[in-house]
């Protein structure tokens, strides 16, 4: 998630919660982003995607994730917003569940935002649904989103740092939280998601626009690996112990198979959005030029829906 320019230069454990989320209200979907797909992956069969909007989500199909929802719709998916708590009947009949920045309370500024967004029975329902063959895309940004989503991610063995992650050696511009992933810096791992179906879909450059770090289970693939220079930083007021720690060996993109299903967990949400921020309408997300975030979104969905093996 993109932070304000002031915040991006203040990565420190003492960063106040108010500063950490400054500028969120100015983030809006880019109305000029081109979501057309020249050759849709699905033209007859249309996998059903449930996009969550029932858990105080910062990103929704009609809001900041509209470009993502429109893009995958144009690729042949049937996207349906979710307005209910997760249960077996809620998930029945869907192929992919997408959850983007669910929160424990409305608004990133809320002191309760880092509380779990999901009840225990909801987490069990999602776990059982994936085990039976469903696919989950769980996206949880920097604080407070990590705390709100870790109860669910742990059902699949994925730990969340629950703070902010920066890399002084691999970043875009002057924001050390905007981490850059390329084959040259060896932070993009080989996986069906990064290979795509052919050379035209291979991922060569990703930017994550300030998120958190993840640690997947042994059988997972960290397709967006963090460098040894990456650090996790947690300011006060985020619902977890403030401090600074190495993020070496962790990731911002993890893929795994779980029972008959598949799971992708991302530690940053803006990279699959297309947003503009501030009076200068600064672009961040899939609408940034020179990056493969748009193709990454499609490849992730292709893997989750079984098009990529």
Residue ranges and their predicted role:
Residues 24-309:
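Short, surface-exposed patches at the edges or C-terminal ends of soluble domains, predominantly
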Residues 2-14:
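Bacterial N-terminal signal peptides that target proteins for export
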Residues 12-22:
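Bacterial N-terminal signal peptides
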């Amino acid at each position: 998630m993109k932070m304000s320019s002031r915040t991006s230069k203040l990565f420190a454990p003492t960063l106040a919660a108010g500063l950490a989320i400054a500028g969120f209200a100015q983030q809006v979907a880019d109305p000029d982003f081109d979501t057309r797909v020249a050759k849709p992956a699905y033209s007859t069969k249309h996998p059903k995607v449930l996009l969550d909007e029932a858990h105080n989500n910062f990103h929704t199909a009609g809001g900041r994730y509209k470009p993502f929802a429109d893009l995958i719709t144009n690729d042949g998916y049937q996207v349906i917003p979710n307005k209910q708590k997760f249960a077996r009947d809620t998930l029945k009949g869907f192929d992919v569940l997408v959850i983007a920045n669910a929160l424990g309370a409305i608004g990133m500024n809320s002191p309760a935002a880092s509380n779990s967004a999901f009840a225990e029975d909801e987490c069990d329902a999602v776990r059982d649904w994936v085990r039976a063959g469903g696919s989950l895309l769980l996206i949880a940004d920097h604080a407070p989103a990590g705390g709100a989503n870790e109860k669910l991610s742990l059902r699949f063995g994925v730990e969340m740092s629950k703070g902010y992650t920066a890399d002084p050696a691999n970043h875009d511009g002057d924001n050390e939280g905007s981490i850059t992933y390329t084959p040259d810096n060896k932070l993009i791992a080989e996986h069906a998601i990064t290979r795509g179906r052919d050379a035209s879909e291979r991922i060569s450059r990703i930017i994550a626009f300030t998120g958190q770090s993840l640690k997947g289970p042994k059988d997972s693939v960290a397709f967006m690996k963090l460098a040894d220079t990456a650090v996790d930083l947690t300011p006060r007021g985020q619902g977890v112990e403030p401090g600074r720690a190495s993020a070496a060996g962790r990731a911002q993109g993890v893929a795994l198979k779980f029972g008959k299903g598949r799971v992708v967990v991302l530690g940053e949400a803006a990279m699959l959005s297309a947003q503009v921020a501030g009076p200068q309408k600064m672009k961040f997300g899939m609408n940034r030029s020179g990056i493969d975030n748009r193709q990454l979104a499609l490849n992730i969905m292709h893997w989750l829906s079984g098009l990529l093996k």
